[in-house]
Amino acid sequence: MEINLDKLNPDIRKLSGMKEVLFDKNLVNSDQDFDLYYMYRGVEEKDGLRYDITVVPAKMLGKEFVKTKGHYHLENWQEVYTVLEGEAIYLMQKRAENGEINDAYFVKANKGESIIIPPLYGHVTINPSKTEQLKMANWVSPNCKVDYKPYEENQGACYYYLDSGWQKNENYANIPELRQEMALKFVPQNLDFLK
């Protein structure tokens, strides 16, 4: 599905809205503010699902690759993401009832590949390129509500993706070893599981 974004007004995530989740404390404490990524929500609706597009330009935030803020879905909502341009790293983490992270994995996805965000997992999307923008689309229920607070309270996800690789976020008490899962080579035909 090709959608012209030029005439649409995105929600813009600026640096000032990300300071609670960044690795680089110099950026956190600075007065700088600039655009990090653009969210075009509800560009299409089909079969009771909402289609969004997010554009994440290539940028380094100190030593950290640019990323989305990260959130959990309230209740058991799932979501499907597909990379339209560039490459993405999706970092997923699952909380136990006591708030500790009991599972963490990442998926690298290239143009045309998809991932499914499972129920009860929080997720962050990273653009791992210093030169290419990431453009991705997602299908989600319009009833899905999100919670950013666990990411804000812990200064980000349980891992940061830096120019030197993965680094554990020491604000979490226990961090499981990070594993890699594979991306889907297609978008699932039947998206009823998202409703």
Question: How does the language model describe each region?
Answer:
Residues 108-129:
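Conserved metal-binding segment of the jelly-roll/cupin
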Residues 2-108, 127-195:
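Active-site region of the double-stranded beta-helix
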